[in-house]
């Protein structure tokens, strides 16, 4: 008799996706981040659901409702900090997942990669709206600054901003609409994840060598389920250490003060995971130019399949490209640091140099070095 998992209409889908899925035999721990991101999304949806039961999306009570969750709800402090730090962990896994895709040439799976970039935008939008909900000082001013960027769009900009605000400033209407959007977006993200996996399973996984591995496949279960469990345990260890010992390590102290439109914080900055893009935005003196650079800093990921000119898919055997990749990684760390610094000398200059370097490496240096490596292959 055939196993039920292979015949049942629903179990069959699960079987083909997670059990009998043919996977390359040589994929490393860098391939764990897909499952870890799934875990992060699950944690965020569950903790968010419990927070939504106690949260009120009204400017007069939002801040005190978060305080009430932390003080009066059973394990409310734990749920709140799991949700806040879960977002941080989500982005750490996301950046590592994207980095792995860039290093090993996974972007040549065009549809999977583009859905992934759309997912990145969706997660960033969700995180931004979630940051506004506690209605602290940085929530209010962050929302004001970031939404105000849309006013740089010619002709319709100002109208668009007021339409998003629901008035002439960030106020009750803004908070009321951000709350349902923040609630529904994770479910849209979950649906997009399904599409992401659908396209991935059409082609099969990439592997560190970048070579076709059709002749050397092993079943996903038990080999990679066990490997993923190790990743999950390490992630949960890091996560719970963060939540239970230093829950405010990655947060902003300003957000413990209720939102006050009459008092501007000395340095408005978003959460750490947006700082690299924020630094690129600030490094251009023109408002529209800054907004375009901000959007393009993420959208540029979609150009990688077009900019790939190397005869080898992975960077595993391309030392020159490897050097550039790690310079790019260091540049992103620099941009993240600069985004958190005040707008003054020498940070302005460092930010501008790092921003130019970011675009130069991706648009010119990597393709040029790839061409050089192609030439060196013939020698």
Curated annotation (Swiss-Prot):
Heme b b562 binds at residues 83, 182. One of its GO terms (cellular component) is respiratory chain complex III. Keywords: Electron transport, Heme, Iron, Membrane, Metal-binding, Mitochondrion, Mitochondrion inner membrane, Respiratory chain, Transmembrane, Transmembrane helix, Transport, Ubiquinone. It comes from the Eukaryota. It is found in: Mitochondrion inner membrane. The keyword NAD does not apply. Belongs to the cytochrome b family. This is Cytochrome b. It comes from Sciurus aestuans (Guianan squirrel).
């Amino acid at each position: 008799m055939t196993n039920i998992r292979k015949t049942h209409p629903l179990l069959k889908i699960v079987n083909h996706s997670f059990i009998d899925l043919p996977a390359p035999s040589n994929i490393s721990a860098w391939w764990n981040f897909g499952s870890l991101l799934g875990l992060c999304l699950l944690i965020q949806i569950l903790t968010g659901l419990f927070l939504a039961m106690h949260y009120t999306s009204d400017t007069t009570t939002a801040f005190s409702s978060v305080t009430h969750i932390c003080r009066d709800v059973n394990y409310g402090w734990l749920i709140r900090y799991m949700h806040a730090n879960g977002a941080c962990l989500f982005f750490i896994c996301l950046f590592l997942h994207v980095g792995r895709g860039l290093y090993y040439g996974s972007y040549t799976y065009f549809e999977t990669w583009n859905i992934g970039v759309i997912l990145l935008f969706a997660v960033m939008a969700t995180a931004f709206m979630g940051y506004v909900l506690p209605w602290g000082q940085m929530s209010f001013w962050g929302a004001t600054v970031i939404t105000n960027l849309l006013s740089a769009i010619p002709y319709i900009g100002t109208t668009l901003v007021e339409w998003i605000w629901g008035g002439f400033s960030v106020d009750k209407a803004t908070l009321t609409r951000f709350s349902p959007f923040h609630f529904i977006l994770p479910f849209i993200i979950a649906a997009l994840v399904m599409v992401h996996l659908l396209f991935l399973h059409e082609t099969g996984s990439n592997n560190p060598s970048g070579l076709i591995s059709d002749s050397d496949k092993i079943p996903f279960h038990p080999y990679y389920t066990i490997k993923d469990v190790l990743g999950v345990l390490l992630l949960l260890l890091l996560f719970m250490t963060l939540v239970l010992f230093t829950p405010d390590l990655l947060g902003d102290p300003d957000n413990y003060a209720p939102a006050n439109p009459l008092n501007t914080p000395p340095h408005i900055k978003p959460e750490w995971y947006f700082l690299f893009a924020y630094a690129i935005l600030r490094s251009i003196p023109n408002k529209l130019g800054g907004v375009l650079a901000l959007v393009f800093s993420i959208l540029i990921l979609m150009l990688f399949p077009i900019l790939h000119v190397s005869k080898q898919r992975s960077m595993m055997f391309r030392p020159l490209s490897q050097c550039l990749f790690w310079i790019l990684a260091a540049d992103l760390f620099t941009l993240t640091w600069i985004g958190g610094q005040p707008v003054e000398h020498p940070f302005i200059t460092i930010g501008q140099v790092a921003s130019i370097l970011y675009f130069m490496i991706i648009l010119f240096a990597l393709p040029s070095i790839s061409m050089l490596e192609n030439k060196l292959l013939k020698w």
